Every structure is written in structure tokens, then in C-alpha cells.
Amino acid sequence: MKKMLAALLSALTLLTCGIFSDCTAEKRQPDTDAVWETLSEAYIYAFPLVLTDATKTLSTNTDGSMAGRAPVNQFNHAKKLADASFRTVVTPNVDTVYSQAWLDIGAEPLVYVLPETDRFCNVQILDAWTNTAAVLDKAGVYAIALPDWEGELPDGVTRVNVPTASVWSIARVVLSGDEDLPHVYAIQEQMQLLPLSAYGQEERYTVPQGRYVKENDFVPVNKVLSMTPGEFFNTANTLMQANPPADADRELLEKLSAIRVGAGMTFDDSLLGEDAAERWAQMLQGLRATLSADSAKYAQKLGQWRYYGKPIGDFGTAYTYRAMVALVGLGANTVDVAIYPKTAVDETGAALRGEKTYTLHFASLPPTRAGGFWSVTAYGADDFLIDNPIHRYCINDRSAFELNEDGTLDLVLSRNAPENTANWLPVSDGGFHLFLRIYVPDMEALDAWQPPVIREQQEI
């Protein structure tokens, strides 16, 4: 027995001394360089979880009277498309109207009713770690539940398992302009969201009143980036209790436990050394560059365009990629639902400038599967939509553009209007960039597809 105890103590000593120097019985001095290396891994790992929670806190911070927000387990239905005055989210989508809801399925499943529609309408179900747990793309009645929930569902209700108690649902409904909004409103009115215990007796169900807290009015990413190490990691540790990490994370979590990062733990900031504040600030300042460099391998090339490919939206152990996408595009779709190629240069590699006039030439239109669609949207250097006299922010497959006789398509990108504005996409005075959004893309056909080319028009 004594030999067994000695062996166990020896093993524990080796385990805990991995990030400590001078590991003696009397005193352990932290090896701060090793601690900070592990800390950086922990931050990248937990960043999407903490940012998602901050976004939820802001989005549900309402007593029910604030546009653009809704209490937990209730819909926030957008009522119009973004325009040049919109400044809430960068590079806003002007193809679909959103109906979002933040769900808490810890106590019981939530029932989501998706009506029949005559158009693209799907619901992305994300877990607390920003992975897409499911996509609801057919009309039906769904029960969003934790995997270990053991109750019975009524007939006709389809179970959808999500591994975390906190769930973000994003419904996207395509429309053809403002004149089409009444049809979208009709779809929104038929959507339902309620606890399973209230399903079938909706007339007795009273929607809970939300609550507004002034301190929770913040910009989520700024809130997270302003946290101290203790605030950040203790928030993450608490969130992991209701939103457990995936089994595939076990190896990393064993490593992170040495600095007290894990479900239910209390972070020990005494390990960080005397210059902790300075090193923390330096780490955060270099975060975007670190994430971008480490995630570059996931960027897919499409001519002069680039987009982020697999495993976006279903990240597995690609922790750095997951953190980068959370930072620049929280709630990204998987590639089978949509891809978002971007370019800021013409065919020569020169930066796009509004002082010039360009032709965006499609040899053929973007390949999509049944129900798919596409759009080209212009954004200014500030990543927002560009103000223009005809209030046109994109050209899409629903637009009244004119094809060439050979079936190709030429769009005009310019600051000033051409004589024929049918194919004109207005741009800004200075620099600008484009997003080519392809929804329900045909990924096999995409490999052989010739992407559009941007050519500067030469003055004659």
C-alpha cells in the first residue's frame, strides 16, 4: 500500500510540475512563461463561449419594449432589411430577414414551430460554443432538447438534440425587396416558440416578462476584451457547467486544469506573475493577428475571391479557427448552407477605389442547389452599406438586371450612375469591397465554376 501511495504522489507531482519550476514540498514557484503559453491556449479555447454569452446578455436585455431585442425563449423578429443608416453589425446581410431567439433548454425542451413557406427559410441552431447543432429547413414542429433529457414527446414533434443548455436560433427568410416584406411578416406570425410543458395549451401560456439592466447595455466583443483574466476565465468556468465542452476537448482540458480553467473551477490568477496586467494587454492586442495567421489555412480561393471553408460552423477541435470566426463573424453558417466569398481587389490585384469604374463580369451565374440564391453586396471601408441615391445595396438573383446576349452578366461598379442603371451597383468615394454570398451552394459545381472577374474600365 505504501508503494502504491508513493507512486501516486510521484505521478501527481509530475503532472502538476508541468508548468511549475522549483517544485518542492515547501513552495512551488510558477514558471510564468509556461503558464502564459497555456493561458493563451485557454483564452482562444474559451473565447467563443464567453463572447456568445455576452451577446446573449445584450440581446435579451429588455423588458420587451425594445426593438432588436427579446427576452430569453422569445422571438426577436426583424421588420426590415438593413440600409446605409444601419450601424449595429458590420457587413450586414440584405438578402434575408432574421428571426432570432436565445433559448434556455436546461429545465425542459423548447418547442419550435416552423410554418410552410414558399421560399428559402431555414433555422440555424447553434450551441453555446458556436457550433451548428442542427439546421431546420422543413416545416414542422421541433423540440430543442439536451441529449440527456428523458421525457416523451407528443406525436408529430421531432426531437433535435443540442449539447448545451444555452442555444441560439437564427431563422433566415429570403425576400425580394421591401415590397415583399408583408409576406415575410406572415411567416413570422406563424412561427411559434414555447416550453414543451405549454405545448398544446398555448391559450394558457403567458410569455414571461423580460428585465432591462442598464449595466448590460454594452458592445459584446468590447465587453469580453475588457475583462481581466479572473473575470474572463471564471466566467468561462461557470458557463462550462451548463454548457459542457465536447468529449473531443478532453485532452486540452486536462492541460488547462493546471491553471484552474475548467467547469466549476476557480481560476488562480496568482500564477500569472507580477507583470500580469501588461502581458495580458499584450496578448489581447495581438489576438486578431494571431487568429488570422493561424486560420489562414482554412481560407479557400475562388479566383480573386476568398472565403472561409470547412470546418466553419462545425469546428471540432479547430479552436483557433473557431475563435477567429467568432471574432469576425459570430454565428457563421456551415458551407452547405452558405459561403461568403469576399474581394477588395480587381483582376490585377489593385485595391478597389470608388474614383474608378469597374465591370464585374460573370461568365455564368453562381451554382446553387434547389432553393439556393446569390447576391453581390458592396461595403465601404468602414464595413457598412454605402449610401446612394437609388438606395441599392446589392444586386441578386431576384434583381431586374439585364443579361448579355450570350447569357453572361456584366455589373457596373461606380460612384456615379451610368446611363442604364439596371446593372449598376453603387460604390463609395474611397475604398470598398464586395461580398458574393451564395446560399445553398452546389459545392461540386463550384470547383469547375469560373468566378466573376473585376476589370477596371478604361477611359476612351
Located regions from the model:
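Bacterial Sec-dependent signal peptides at the C-terminal "C-region" and cleavage site
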Residues: 12-29
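A compositional/structural signature for long, glycine/proline-rich flexible linkers
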Residues: 26-460
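Intrinsic disorder/low-complexity segments
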Residues: 7, 17-21, 449
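Bacterial N-terminal signal peptides that target proteins for export
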Residues: 1-8
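A periodicity- and composition-biased signal for non-globular, repetitive helical segments
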Residues: 8-9, 443
